[in-house]
Amino acid sequence: MAIREILTVPDPRLKQVSKPVEGGVTDDIRALMDDMLETMYDAPGIGLAAIQIGVPLRVIVMDLAREGEEPAPRYFVNPEILETIEEKKPYEEGCLSVPDIFDQVERSARCRIRYLDYDGKQVDEWAEDLYAVCIQHEMDHLEGTLFIDYLSRLKRDRAIDKVKKAKIRAIREDAN
């Protein structure tokens, strides 16, 4: 397993649409998911899409366990949202690709999803609350959409500028 670099805005690769995984869940895909999970835990975060580490495949990892609980990793290959309920709720979201930025985004409180798990088994289930929000957020990444794309242009531009400035500060600090 290896910790990979997480892409941050305004990296254009984050706007790519990810391709389906062909040939099922192979050892290479499992190795990718293992790296993604280690990267996500190191960040730390609760979800990560493969495109966030520069791999344009429809793969997501997630762990919604609270601090102090046993890890509960989940793996999603070629996930699809089959159905959502009409009721939407605002949730405060953040993103490892938009570090230190948080804002309200409206999402369906419940959605039905289908995906292949770590072992290649097809799963069809309903996701609710934080699970529903997180899967929708991560699946947006697979379509090249970031949570800040739901914000006003002003808020989005400010978020990108803040991330750019933080990168410049970090580079300067590393140089000293």
UniProtKB/Swiss-Prot annotation:
Reactions this protein catalyses: N-terminal N-formyl-L-methionyl-[peptide] + H2O = N-terminal L-methionyl-[peptide] + formate
InterPro entries: Peptide_deformylase (IPR023635), Peptide_deformylase_sf (IPR036821)
Gene3D superfamilies: Peptide deformylase (3.90.45.10)
Superkingdom of origin: Bacteria
Active site: 138
Binding site for Fe cation: 95, 137, 141
Family: Belongs to the polypeptide deformylase family.
Protein name per the record: Peptide deformylase
Lineage of the organism: Bacteria, Pseudomonadati, Pseudomonadota, Alphaproteobacteria, Hyphomonadales
